[in-house]
Each structure stands twice: as structure tokens, then as C-alpha cells.
Amino acid sequence: MTIALGRFTKEEKDLFDIMDDWLRRDRFVFVGWSGLLLFPCAYFALGGWFTGTTFVTSWYTHGLASSYLEGCNFLTAAVSTPANSLAHSLLLLWGPEAQGDFTRWCQLGGLWTFVALHGAFGLIGFMLRQFELARSVQLRPYNAIAFSAPIAVFVSVFLIYPLGQSGWFFAPSFGVAAIFRFILFFQGFHNWTLNPFHMMGVAGVLGAALLCAIHGATVENTLFEDGDGANTFRAFNPTQAEETYSMVTANRFWSQIFGVAFSNKRWLHFFMLFVPVTGLWMSALGVVGLALNLRAYDFVSQEIRAAEDPEFETFYTKNLLLNEGIRAWMAAQDQPHENLIFPEEVLPRGNAL
């Protein structure tokens, strides 16, 4: 029996090879296989958002004006969620709600599901792009892993939370003031700021900002003065092999300041990755819990004592009263489909009235 040793080579390139060559070619803007998902989805998500904020009203879904055409500005314009009566319908243009009528589709809130779903897949495509490029240049995939954190937050807030509620209506609309409204809603109806997952998210984001500031300042403080350029950016060759700052000096400085310091760069930079990513993951988990209407801390003993003793009040019981005010005000204004009517004496009054 004869055994032939050698490498198998194709005589001709098939369609996959041709596409792979073109997609992964070295060009100014890398496309890649991930680009087949990223670029169309990002284009449609951004296009839908610009279209909605420019032309489309929220009168039929929220009883609001929400477009530049109606007089809104960048901070008040939004692509609003569909009405609560449409529940979790995907609101396809050709579906039973719009029946192929583009104007009716926009009026019903179809642009929101369009932007939300294309936006989610666009973010996933961007993460896959980082995986693909890292693999191409033989890097580890920590950039993509880090980017999974904002994806988790987006998916939990815009998709999982409304799926746990009665409809897309309770998701945030895509706009600046609309997001603020959603934050107030979360506080009033879920007491979100007292949720430990929210606390971990805040600690992660603010802790990451602190770490970035400390790290950047420390590197700037310990730069070697071995270049004759006019400033930091001209003094060093970007391809030089040697380091441009002293880790030993930085370690000694922070050891004197805090008594402890990072001993090597790997642990330092992993910690800078770990803090914000873990914080965002935890906050995403908390939002999933809110989708199921899970409650966080309830200090019942303080509530009972405050109810029995008018002179006893804590910041916790005060916040509960504020939350009641938010609910009383927002329920009628924010959910017009419920036709809620509250007596005047229970509604908060302000200078705007």
C-alpha cells in the first residue's frame, strides 16, 4: 500500500475563499465577516433613529410631540416606544398592525422595534469585529470581552426589561429626555437606587473613571525625559522597544501614598478592565431582576415605625414618600392608556403648574 504525504491544495478557489479574501483584505476600513452583520445593522439603526427624531410623532403612542418637525430639539426629540396595547409585537412593516403602510407603521411605533433590534445586532456585530480583528493579528480577545458589558446593559434595559413587563411601551424611548424619564420611572416604581446591583454598577463606572484618572496621571508623572522633542508626543518614537515611563517609580510613589500599590502592569491593567466590566454586568443582572418585578431592600421595621410615629423619619422612609410622589405623578401622565384619575390633593404641585 502506498501512502502519499503532502499538503492538500485546492485547484480553484470556491465562493467562500473568494469572499474571505475580499472581506478580510487589508484596507483603510476593515470589513470582515463581522461587517456583514455590523454595517447593515448600524446603518439601519442610525437611519431609523434620525428618521424618527426628525419626522415621526409620538402622539399615537404616548400623546407627545417627539420630532424636530413638531418643535423638539436634540435633547427632547425621541423615537418612542409602541403603545402598551401592542404588547410585544415585533411590529413588522408587513405585519397585521401596519399591513405594509409605512406611515401607519411609523405612527404605531414600528421605528422603535426597528431601531432596538438592529441596534442590538449592530452592537453584537461590533463585538464580533473586535474578536475577528484580534484573531487576525494574534491578539487576545479582551477588547471584545470588555465590550460585552455595554451590550449586556443595552439588551437588559431595552429588550429584556420590557419583555418582562406588559409590552415594549415600558422600555426607554430613544432620546435624551426620554432616557431621563425612564430613569425617574425606574426610581419611582422599582426604587432602583437602593438596589445592590445598581450600587455595583455605580461603583464600577465611577471606580473605572477614578482608575483611569489615576493611571493616566501616574504615567504622565513618571515619563522618562530621554527625548529631545518639544513635547511628550514628539519625544518618543511610537515603535521604540524600551518603555517610556517608570513602573518602579510609580510603584514606590503609590506605596508611600496608600501603603499598597500594583506590583506589575498585568495586574494593574486587568483590574482596570475588571472594575467597569463587572459593574456593568452586575447592573444588567439587576435590570433583569426588575423585569421580573423582584424587589431589593425593604426595611420594613423602619416603615412600620415611621407609620406609627410621625416624628420618626429616615432617609429611607423619606425616599419612599418621594417614590410615591413619582408614581402618583407619572402614572397618569406617563400611562394615558390606563385613564387614571387622581384627586387633586394627592398630586404634587410645582412652579410649572
Swiss-Prot record:
Keywords, comma-separated and alphabetical: Acetylation, Chlorophyll, Chloroplast, Chromophore, Electron transport, Iron, Magnesium, Membrane, Metal-binding, Oxidoreductase, Phosphoprotein, Photosynthesis, Photosystem II, Plastid, Thylakoid, Transmembrane, Transmembrane helix, Transport
Q: Recorded E.C. number(s)?
A: 1.10.3.9
Which residues does this entry mark as bearing Phosphothreonine?
2
Which residues are involved in binding chlorophyll a PD2? 198
SUPFAM superfamilies in the record, alphabetically?
Answer: Bacterial photosystem II reaction centre, L and M subunits (SSF81483)
Tell me which residues bind pheophytin a. Answer: 130, 143
Chief location of this protein within or outside the cell: plastid
| Biological-process GO terms, alphabetical | photosynthetic electron transport in photosystem II
Q: Which domain of life is it from?
A: Eukaryota
* Cofactor details (free text): The D1/D2 heterodimer binds P680, chlorophylls that are the primary electron donor of PSII, and subsequent electron acceptors. It shares a non-heme iron and each subunit binds pheophytin, quinone, additional chlorophylls, carotenoids and lipids. There is also a Cl(-1) ion associated with D1 and D2, which is required for oxygen evolution. The PSII complex binds additional chlorophylls, carotenoids and specific lipids.
The reply on keyword Ion transport is no
Sites binding Fe cation sit at 215, 269
Q: Which parts of the sequence bind chlorophyll a ChlzD2?
A: 118
Any idea which GO molecular function terms this record carries? chlorophyll binding; electron transporter, transferring electrons within the cyclic electron transport pathway of photosynthesis activity; iron ion binding; oxygen evolving activity
Positions of a plastoquinone binding: 215, 262
Sites where N-acetylthreonine occurs are at 2
Query: Which additional comment does the entry carry?
Result: 2 of the reaction center chlorophylls (ChlD1 and ChlD2) are entirely coordinated by water.
Describe the family membership recorded for this protein in Swiss-Prot or TrEMBL.
Answer: Belongs to the reaction center PufL/M/PsbA/D family.
Q: How does it assemble?
A: PSII is composed of 1 copy each of membrane proteins PsbA, PsbB, PsbC, PsbD, PsbE, PsbF, PsbH, PsbI, PsbJ, PsbK, PsbL, PsbM, PsbT, PsbX, PsbY, PsbZ, Psb30/Ycf12, at least 3 peripheral proteins of the oxygen-evolving complex and a large number of cofactors. It forms dimeric complexes.
Q: What is this protein called?
A: Photosystem II D2 protein
The species this protein was found in: Ceratophyllum demersum (Rigid hornwort)
| Species lineage | Eukaryota, Viridiplantae, Streptophyta, Embryophyta, Tracheophyta
